[in-house]
């Protein structure tokens, strides 16, 4: 009988939720939900130097915003933070010490640095050399006594089987193996401050929580042999491992970096700019996984039903901000008006634009929005000075038929009564100008659009003119003549 599927997302509360970590959480979530398993949130907070106040809350809030839920977490279960599990780690460290599978190491940071420098100068691969090699029992006892008398606090190191082979069938990359002799020597499982290192604590946690599958980024591949060593030392069965490919910047082809200013990399950024969470969820789900076919827009329920771990990509996933914005626009275009207006409202309110026209303006620009904050620059025409024309727009307005078109359309607007001034009546007036002047197509519509709005492209022209108002529209046209 196969083990129940239990997967986890285990963030460190060291900052905001990054797109890469969000993908790790999302793939674990989809895997659990697809197979009727359990999705667990565990907080790995043993790195006290990098601990950020509110880091845990930020992680959980942003996961919830994306639409993920979980079955077990620090919110519902005790000891789901590593800082609450120190006694458990100590229990297993003591066991390994008692069995001779680990030992206390008194070498100082200065000595380690000097040895590393010597090895590099000699062209050797840096590795820890067991400080007790060649010592008799008496010499070892004397060495330890002297070090402790000098106040040196030891670390605890795992005794590595240098001839061991550590291999696994990776869910994404296939068979991977490491030789024990290439790990870098005996490695620290407990730091001087008493906290366990990541590669030790994560094994204890995964075993204790009965994790069946560990799905994470391939930057963790080098950690896996060390973790397999701990499973071996403690006599435990290891879970299955799957290492997702890196996310790269589609423009540079390099690993996505926090210095890449052409991308929004933190979930908080998408929240602040007014993206729909469903769009961000959909986009992240396709970073390194492909359901097959041409379709790219999927609901959360569809993604759960379609998710197949065998379709996780072996090639790097390209993060394309333009693709994200295209997908976001698709979601906003097809969302109900109330949803989009609720996203836009805070931005309109902050800008002092929550007027009687606010709903109409959101309706007008809804098809263009990639994020709700764009409602402000898009509606500048209605609240700010007329924009400066671009060179391309000036070129259009220099056309020989422009004056004829604008004079004729201005006359049509002036002749309209207040009662008749409605979007459905404005378009026939433009067509009437075409009939009277014989000017049509771009030569007709483009000068009117630029004269009224200062832009070559935009929403439906009659609606723009209506919301701008007859007097304002006439004023703008006069200024162009």
From Swiss-Prot:
Q: Which UniProt keywords apply?
A: Aminoacyl-tRNA synthetase, ATP-binding, Cytoplasm, Ligase, Nucleotide-binding, Protein biosynthesis
Please name every pair of cysteines joined by a disulfide bond in this record. Answer: none
- GO CC list: cytosol
| Positions annotated to bind ATP | 258
What EC number(s) does the entry state? 6.1.1.17
User: Which positions does the motif 'HIGH' region occupy?
Assistant: 11-21
The sequence motif named 'KMSKS' region is recorded at 255-259
**Cellular localisation:** Cytoplasm
Q: Which GO terms describe its molecular function?
A: ATP binding; glutamate-tRNA ligase activity; tRNA binding; zinc ion binding
Q: Which domain of life is it from?
A: Bacteria
Q: Which PROSITE patterns match?
A: AA_TRNA_LIGASE_I
Record GO biological process: glutamyl-tRNA aminoacylation
Q: Which reaction does it catalyse?
A: tRNA(Glu) + L-glutamate + ATP = L-glutamyl-tRNA(Glu) + AMP + diphosphate
Q: Which family does it belong to?
A: Belongs to the class-I aminoacyl-tRNA synthetase family. Glutamate--tRNA ligase type 1 subfamily.
Function, as annotated: Catalyzes the attachment of glutamate to tRNA(Glu) in a two-step reaction: glutamate is first activated by ATP to form Glu-AMP and then transferred to the acceptor end of tRNA(Glu).
* PANTHER family xrefs: GLUTAMATE--TRNA LIGASE (PTHR43311), GLUTAMATE--TRNA LIGASE, MITOCHONDRIAL-RELATED (PTHR43311:SF2)
Question: Quaternary form?
Answer: Monomer.
Output this protein's name: Glutamate--tRNA ligase
The organism encoding this protein is Streptococcus pyogenes serotype M3 (strain ATCC BAA-595 / MGAS315)
Lineage of the species this protein comes from: Bacteria, Bacillati, Bacillota, Bacilli, Lactobacillales
* Gene of this entry: gltX
């Amino acid at each position: 009988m196969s083990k129940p599927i239990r997967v986890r997302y285990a963030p460190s509360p060291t900052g905001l939720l990054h797109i890469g970590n969000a993908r790790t959480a999302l793939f674990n979530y989809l895997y659990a939900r697809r197979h009727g398993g359990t999705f667990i949130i565990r907080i790995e907070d043993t790195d006290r130097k990098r601990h950020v106040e509110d880091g845990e809350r930020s992680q959980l809030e942003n996961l919830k915003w994306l639409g993920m839920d979980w079955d077990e977490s620090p919110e519902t279960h005790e000891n789901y933070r590593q800082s609450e599990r120190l006694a458990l780690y100590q229990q297993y460290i003591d066991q390994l010490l008692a069995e001779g599978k680990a030992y206390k190491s008194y070498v100082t940071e200065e000595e380690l640095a000097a040895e590393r420098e010597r090895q590099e100068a000699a062209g050797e691969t840096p590795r820890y050399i067991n400080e007790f090699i060649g010592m008799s029992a008496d010499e070892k006892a004397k060495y330890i006594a002297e070090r402790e008398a000098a106040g040196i606090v030891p670390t605890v190191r795992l005794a590595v089987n240098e001839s061991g082979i550590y291999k696994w069938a990776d869910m994404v990359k296939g068979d991977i193996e490491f030789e024990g002799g290439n790990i870098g020597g005996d490695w620290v499982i407990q730091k001087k401050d008493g906290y366990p290192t990541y590669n030790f604590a994560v094994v204890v946690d995964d075993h204790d929580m009965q994790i069946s599958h560990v799905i994470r980024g391939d930057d963790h591949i080098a950690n896996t042999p060390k973790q397999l060593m701990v499973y071996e030392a403690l006599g435990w069965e290891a879970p299955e491992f799957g290492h997702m490919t890196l996310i790269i910047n589609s423009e540079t082809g390099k690993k996505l970096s926090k210095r890449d200013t052409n991308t929004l990399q933190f979930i908080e950024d998408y929240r602040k700019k007014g993206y729909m969470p469903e769009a961000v969820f959909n986009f992240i789900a396709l970073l390194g996984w492909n359901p097959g076919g041409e379709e790219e827009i999927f609901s959360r329920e569809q993604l759960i039903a379609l998710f197949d771990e065998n379709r996780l990509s072996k090639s790097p996933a390209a993060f394309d901000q333009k693709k994200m914005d295209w997908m976001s626009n698709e979601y906003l275009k097809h969302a109900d008006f109330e949803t989009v207006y609720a996203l836009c409202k805070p931005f309109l309110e902050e800008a002092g634009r929550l007027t009687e026209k606010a709903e109409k303006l959101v309706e007008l620009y809804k098809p263009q929005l990639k994020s709700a904050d764009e409602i402000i620059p898009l509606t500048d025409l209605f609240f700010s000075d007329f924009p400066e024309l671009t060179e391309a727009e000036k070129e259009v307005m220099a056309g020989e038929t422009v004056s004829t078109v604008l004079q004729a359309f201005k006359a049509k607007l002036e002749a309209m009564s207040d009662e008749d001034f409605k979007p459905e009546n404005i378009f026939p007036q433009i067509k009437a100008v075409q009939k009277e002047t014989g000017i049509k197509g771009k030569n007709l519509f483009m000068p009117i659009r630029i004269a009224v709005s200062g832009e070559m492209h935009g929403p439906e022209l009659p609606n723009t003119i209506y919301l701008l108002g007859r007097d304002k529209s006439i004023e703008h046209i006069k200024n162009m003549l």
